[in-house]
Amino acid sequence: LSFCLAACCNEIIESPESKSEDDFTSKMGLHILGSNDTRSSISPDEDQIKNICVMAYDEKDGRLACAQTARSADEIEMELRAGTYNIYVTANMGEFDAPIKEQDIGDAFHSIEDIAQLGQALPMCWKDRTVLKAGEKTTLYAKLSRLVSKVDFSVETGVLEGLEITSVRLCQAAGVIRPFMEGGS
């Protein structure tokens, strides 16, 4: 007994092996938008970025697909498989310890050991969801949010005779920041 099967097709169907890696990957860059919502009257450079960390989590399985730390957003370029990603960005926190599973991102933290650690570059963050298409470069436009505020206090005692300041106290200064915790840190 013999059996024969034949088919006709007008189009050539490419097998996945015949496609190049570029047909499945996408490049992602980052651009930081200026923050005009809050500006300092004392130090105009508080929005500067000394370092930035970008983490991309695959929406399908919630796992870390890529993480990069750089001195500026211009240095960030990720190559990822086409798909949907949740992107998390931290600034001025050094190399952020990105968890492997996205569900653990709320527990990730940054410690502030000393107020001098903040300098003029305040910790900031941003998150968003993006779809990356195969063979295309996508630029994300991030508007970072400050995670701390800085208060400078100065008094000219010569203006008011008899004024004597005995103490100044700052309450509720964060020692730990959890930038992506639901409801704040």
Spans of model-derived segments:
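Sec-dependent N-terminal signal peptides
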Residues: 1-3
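C-terminal motif of bacterial Sec signal peptides marking the signal peptidase cleavage site
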Residues: 5-7
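Short helix-loop boundary/capping segments
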Residues: 157-185
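Short, low-hydrophobicity acidic/polar segments
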Residues: 10, 16-21, 26-162
